[in-house]
Amino acid sequence: MEQETPEKVDSAQEKVRGKSQPADDSEDSREKAGTEGTGELTEAYELQVAEEMAKEIKKKIRRKLKEQLTYFPPDTLLHDDKLGSEKRKKKKKKKVPVPAKPETSPSDVCDSAAEGEQKKEGAPEGSHHREGGCSTEQNADASVPENTKPKPKKMKKKPKAVSEDNEETNGDGVHEITGRDSPVHPKCLLDDDLVMGVYIHRTDRLKSDFMISHPMVKIHVVDEHTGQYVKKDDSERPVSSYYEKDNVDYILPIMTQPYDFKKLKSRLPEWEEQVIFNENFPYLLREFDECPKVILFFEILDFLSMDEIKNNSEFQNQECGFRKIAWAFLKLLGANGNANINSKLRLQLYYPPTKPRSQPNVVEVFEWWSKCPRNRYPSTLYVTVRGLKVPDCIKPSYRSMMALQEERGTPVYCERHRETSSVDTEPGLEDSKEEVKWKRLPGQACRIPNKHLFSLNAGERGCFCLDFSHNGRILAAACASRDGYPIILYEIPSGRFMRELCGHLNIIYDLDWSKDDRYLVTSSSDGTARVWKNEINSTSTFRVLPHPSFVYTARFHPATRELVVTGCYDSMIRIWKVDAREDAAILVRQLDVHKSFVNSICFDDEGHHMYSGDCIGVIAVWDTYVKVTDVQHSVRHWTINKEIKETEFRGVPVSYLEVHPNGKRLLIHTKDSTLRIMDLRILAARKFVGAANYREKIHSTLTPCGTLLFSGSEDGIVYVWNPETGEQVAMYSELPFKSTIRDISYHPFENMVAFCAFGQSEPILLYIYDFQVAQQEAEMLKRYSGTVPLPGIHLSEDALCTCPKLPQQGSFQIDEFVNTENNSSRKIQLVKQRLETVTEVIRSCAAKVNKNLSITSPPPGPAKKPRVKQSFVLTTDQIIHQFGVPQTAFISIERRPFMRPVDPPPMVVALYDYTASRSDELTIHRGDIIRVFFKDNEDWWYGSLGKGQEGFFPANHVASETLYRDSPPKVKERSPPLTPKEKAKMEKPPASRKSLIKDRFLDSRLGSKPMGHSEKGRDQNFEERGHKSDMEMKKSEPTVRKVTLIE
């Protein structure tokens, strides 16, 4: 080591005095200037300030140099010099000869350190200085004046890297800091509350080796002086394990979890694991003689199978049956005195020696570092070392994962009992002990929510489906954003954001809670169904259920949360066993009864029966009884009970199925704009019309009491019916949705409902029933009871109990309602008026769907005209009846269009044959007459053949009737001539069509089947079906709403 002479120290002191000399001269000049005149006072003041600054600099330099004596005693310097000289003898590269100098006193060492820092600042950035050279803190370096330039030295250029503890000039063992932070001196880390944490990030791609399948990292904490593991600061303190024995007085090594290439489908190891050593962190960073000089060694290992150990004798001698892949090292304190902590470091990996010379009582990896040549491995390891503050309370676990975590076990029956009870402890909530008092009493009939509660964020693209948990405390929403498709959990009733569950790569079609609300299952078009744990800190996927195609539905079995049933695009129903004690989900059975893709699955409350619906209108009923003690054996005995194939919706996709709360009826939502509730005993169904649904997947729902039916629509309106009578009792027509309302969920314990839509920036809306709003309405109706209509009354929409609170106010018009006499003629007249009103409503709905139904149509722009203001026409006697019997009576809110003639849909004639290539397309033949419902774009139109067949067809394959008549003979020859019946159908006046519509609807309302007219034949039935579809598609004219009640 190069030593400094007293002459050199004196020269350094003269350099320091050199700056103070101009200050003395300036003081004499200042005194002379003061005698000359007051005009030179300013110059004298400046000189005085410069003198004081020079004195401060001298004091600061002396203080910094004295501090170095405490950190670099002469014995340590001599010891390091000897070690460095031994290693320099082994180097093959040439170095510039440095003349030897005699030993110096401690003061000489301080001056030498000061001059070394001046040379260091003058050197270019990234250069490597001699090993063993003393360095001071960076603050002292910045304060040392540079009056003289150091002599240039010839140095070999090296790759740009930050060498913190490099012991050789050739760069072996370079530790590169990827996150450039300012160096940390151990002096700054004197907080005794910190423990050492080593974060293992990842490696670069490892060398291709088929024998490496699940690598892991083993971390050793070794003392450089002794070659042994570092002694504990407190021998009784557990450092690596919670159950360390008292006789273990050193720090045991710790290993990370293995990274399974096959399971994680990646050959780039990314552990991202925090390893905690419960040792005093400042103790490992001190530089005193009695403190250890710590080196961290990292071994990348892979465990061997028993067959490999038995068949290969070379493996039998290796430690613990591990295959050693590579190793790296890191000094906590570098050669420059700075600590390699609080930043991400990149460590060079080395091959382990082929024939290691293992000695007893010596750490093997330390022998590799100190005595064996280092052969670089073509990869690096990324780590971060930092001090961690231990939390005050660490929750015990069944298996301790760190030295601070207690291991506590409980009997199996206690664990199952606690997990199955969801009343006392509500899962996934931080304030689970806080009880929420719901307003709806047990057994009380549900009310129609009439007040807007709040809106929730659903991402940039809206929400596709949502569902309340069984305890009512969490709302799960399957949303879509620019970056992915997260499941967002909101706390109810506060609406507070809880967490996001990220993992799906495409639209989430369905979600379902387990019976105890501890698990959530979702199905997506990315080909997977995922099971999530409902825990406070759990945001990753618990189990993944892979499928060959889109997964449309997924449900937990009500009897056990270990069974998950999924419906897929490949027409298969799969039953999975999801057990927390096993690593992966098990596919128990596949059911292949359906001939088309399965859209919906549901269970009854006991789980004895399962119902599945597909795309061609077939509903299968299954016997699904399960024994909790033997789940897999019970699934093998599942059988199909019967298949429901109704002619009314044959070939129509089933969008959603739900069992009525009484367990004897089934809600069937199909894509023909009709909802049905079927009695499962006699298979008789009641229809509910009004909601438009021809293309989108929409979910409807029944309230927990079974007295209300909610359904969304493609026109952005929510419809409410009474399932017992089939009457439409309410309608949310002013919701701020621009897209189809996809899903509705009613709260299990509160008169609360949630709506969602899948579209650009569509929110999640929550409405709640407010008794005060209903009471204000009742008082208003009593005041105007029996009077003539008062068109000038304007009230807030909150005043109507069945209408939600909206951002705009609507006008309410009170009409007189005269009690009718009990004569049959008067009743028939009212029924006819009622039917005419509903007929006009359906036509108005169809017109609106013509404009907004297409999924490929662009969103409404800013130039689009706003929806016309709607008003309510309240009938007095009917509303009084509603409030007189609130449990049984329901309000019917309907829309009445302005009385104007409705043009019939245009008719076109097919010029060429076309075969449908998708399920939503229409197969046409030459000469077919097609009724056009709407034009999706210039190339594709939507229409019906009049045979109950509807779908899209190419616009260039058809021509209008007038163009067909005027077309040249060559074109007509390519198409067959129209039959007399088809010509009569085309020439039939609109008035007769209207009468057919009215008769057809009258028959359906009275519950009777349409009468077959033999004289009109088959073509007339086709005509009636076509007009019915036309009525259900029209809904665009400006409308008013009328509140009526038919007893």
Swiss-Prot record:
Region (Interaction with HAP1) location: 1-285
Basic residues compositional bias, start-end: 87-96, 150-160
Highest rank taxon of the organism: Eukaryota
WD repeat placement: 458-500, 503-542, 546-586, 593-632, 649-688, 692-731, 736-777
Ranges of residues in domain SH3: 903-963
Subcellular location(s) per record: Cytoplasm, Cytoskeleton, Cilium basal body; Cytoplasm, Cytoskeleton, Microtubule organizing center, Centrosome, Centriole; Cell junction, Adherens junction
InterPro entries in the record: AHI1_SH3 (IPR035832), Cilium-Associated_Jouberin (IPR052803), SH3-like_dom_sf (IPR036028), SH3_domain (IPR001452), WD40/YVTN_repeat-like_dom_sf (IPR015943), WD40_repeat_dom_sf (IPR036322), WD40_rpt (IPR001680)
Biased composition (Basic and acidic residues): 1-17, 77-86, 116-132, 173-185, 964-1003, 1012-1040
Gene Ontology biological process terms from the UniProt entry: cell surface receptor protein tyrosine kinase signaling pathway; central nervous system development; cilium assembly; cloaca development; embryonic brain development; eye photoreceptor cell development; heart looping; hindbrain development
Region (Disordered): 1-44, 67-185, 964-1047
Gene Ontology molecular function: any one: identical protein binding
Repeat in keyword set: yes
Cellular-component GO terms for this entry: adherens junction; cell-cell junction; centriole; centrosome; ciliary basal body; cilium; cytoplasm; MKS complex
Modified residues (Phosphoserine): 854, 975
Keywords assigned: Cell junction, Cell projection, Cilium, Cilium biogenesis/degradation, Cytoplasm, Cytoskeleton, Developmental protein, Differentiation, Phosphoprotein, Repeat, SH3 domain, WD repeat
Subunit structure: Self-associates. Part of the tectonic-like complex (also named B9 complex). Interacts with MKS1. Interacts with NPHP1; probably as heterodimers and/or AHI1(2):NPHP1(2) heterotetramers. Interacts (via SH3 domain) with the dynamin GTPase DNM2. Interacts with HAP1; probably as AHI1(2):HAP1(2) heterotetramers. Interacts with RAB8A. Interacts with CEND1. Interacts with SPATA7.
Function: Involved in vesicle trafficking and required for ciliogenesis, formation of primary non-motile cilium, and recruitment of RAB8A to the basal body of primary cilium. Component of the tectonic-like complex, a complex localized at the transition zone of primary cilia and acting as a barrier that prevents diffusion of transmembrane proteins between the cilia and plasma membranes. Involved in neuronal differentiation. As a positive modulator of classical Wnt signaling, may play a crucial role in ciliary signaling during cerebellum embryonic development.
Name the UniProt record assigns to this protein: Jouberin
